[in-house]
């Protein structure tokens, strides 16, 4: 059976930790930040853990991530 390919878009956007959690950057940080509150912008710094249903989908894009 041939090797499964990892989707390039997924490996650029997501990181899988050693414990199997899928991490991603916060959304809504591209443009239009002057409208948003400073608190909203602060909470979107760094990376966040994805929800379980979304993480399962992303994990299927990266078959050798675990």
Curated annotation (Swiss-Prot):
One Pfam family hit? Ribosomal_L35p
Chain intervals with Basic residues compositional bias: 1-15, 28-45
InterPro entries, per this entry?
Ribosomal_bL35, Ribosomal_bL35-like, Ribosomal_bL35_CS, Ribosomal_bL35_sf
What is any one GO biological process for this UniProt entry?
A: translation
Source domain of life: Bacteria
Q: Where is this region: Disordered?
A: 1-49
Which terms are listed as keywords in the entry?
Ribonucleoprotein, Ribosomal protein
For this UniProt entry, the molecular function terms from Gene Ontology, in alphabetical order, are:
structural constituent of ribosome
| Annotated Gene Ontology cellular component terms | ribonucleoprotein complex; ribosome
Q: Which family does it belong to?
A: Belongs to the bacterial ribosomal protein bL35 family.
Name of the featured protein: Large ribosomal subunit protein bL35
